[in-house]
């Protein structure tokens, strides 16, 4: 599998999935943090997108769980709200980057090209 997308918003999941599939990448989708963690532990991914604010297990908690197992996989947090303090905390936790909502297809493709070629 190439990409894991974890987001509680159906529209965001669908948009990212379509972008990946149009570019011939295999995608798994999780609609919450628990599903995302389960998929992460069952499969190997080359790139992960995680929504920061989700009910139940937050994106930050999912990120922390991923980093326990894999320190190197590129992980991008999807967020509509990002203070400079929050960004610094995420970077200290070894986050690869932040994809700010609303995002463009080109912003997503720049990330994909960087990590998946």
Question: Predicted regions: what is each one?
Answer:
Residues 61, 82-97, 106, 110:
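Alpha4 helix (beta4-alpha4-beta5 surface) of REC/receiver domains from two-component response regulators
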Residues 10-28:
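Two-component/phosphorelay signaling modules centered on CheY-like receiver
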Residues 32-35, 58-62:
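Acidic catalytic/metal-coordinating carboxylates
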Residues 54:
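Receiver (REC) domain active-site loop signature in two-component systems and cognate sites
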Residues 29-47:
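Acidic, metal-coordinating helix/loop segments flanking the phosphotransfer/catalytic sites
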Residues 51:
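Active-site residues of response regulator receiver
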Residues 101:
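A Lys-centered signature of the CheY-like receiver
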């Amino acid at each position: 599998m190439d990409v894991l997308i974890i987001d509680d918003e159906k529209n965001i999941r669908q948009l990212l999935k379509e972008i990946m599939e149009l570019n011939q990448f295999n995608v798994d989708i999780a609609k919450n943090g628990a599903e995302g963690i389960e998929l992460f532990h069952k499969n190997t991914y080359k790139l992960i997108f995680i929504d920061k604010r989700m009910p139940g297990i937050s994106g930050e908690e999912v990120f922390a769980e991923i980093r326990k197992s894999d320190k190197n996989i590129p992980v991008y947090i999807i967020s509509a709200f990002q203070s400079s303090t929050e960004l610094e905390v995420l970077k200290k936790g070894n986050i690869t980057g932040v994809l700010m909502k609303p995002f463009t297809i080109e912003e997503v493709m720049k990330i994909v090209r960087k990590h998946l070629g």
